[in-house]
Amino acid sequence: TVYMLPQSIVSVSIATALFTKIASAAADGNQTSMVRNYQIGVRSSLLLTMWMAAILGAAAIPVFQILGPSNAISEMVAYANALVIILPGLAGAVVIIFSQRVFYSMEDGRPVFYTVLWPTLGQVVLGWTLMMFLPPVYWLFGALFAETVSRIVQGVLSTYFVRARLPQANPWVVIGDMVKYGAIAVGAGLLGMGALHFVGAFDTSNTVTGAIWGGFWRAV
């Protein structure tokens, strides 16, 4: 649920709003408008989604402390690590959801199937391969890493399927946005994580963060 918040709030909302324009342009045969709205949707969603992903990644442990205050710190750290591993996959998920809108507007579901098929098979292979070489305690992290790679590959692959239908859609424009906003999110997340660690976000009982949260909940 926490992982899907950025996509549910941002990507789905923007994709729903732009789908009407994309579908209308498809009905009129206006490929230029389709490409423009597709790229605008991807860029704006990547900006906001990866911003939210950076916040969630940096504040992963405080978030899980709020959701499960009675859980042990070790459990929260494990949840937080799992969340951080899969968050980069949101970049691919953003591109996928807008690429799907392009295919749906052209009433062609085949690219959607193939976009998911091959990366998913690769995910299974990569996941099992990592499990062969990792200690059992890291198997879950290996599986999550494989899922993240699969989502990113799905996003990249979908841009080429879009170009096959819309020659004006340059895949590298979208891929460049994925890399740019992904790198910014990673940098911002690391800075935020460092700042929270400095003020003591990992212990809600005897820290500045704990005092803030305690005061907030008492006020509520």
Which residues make up each language-model segment?
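Membrane-embedded alpha-helical bundles of multi-pass transporters/translocases
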Residues: 1-220
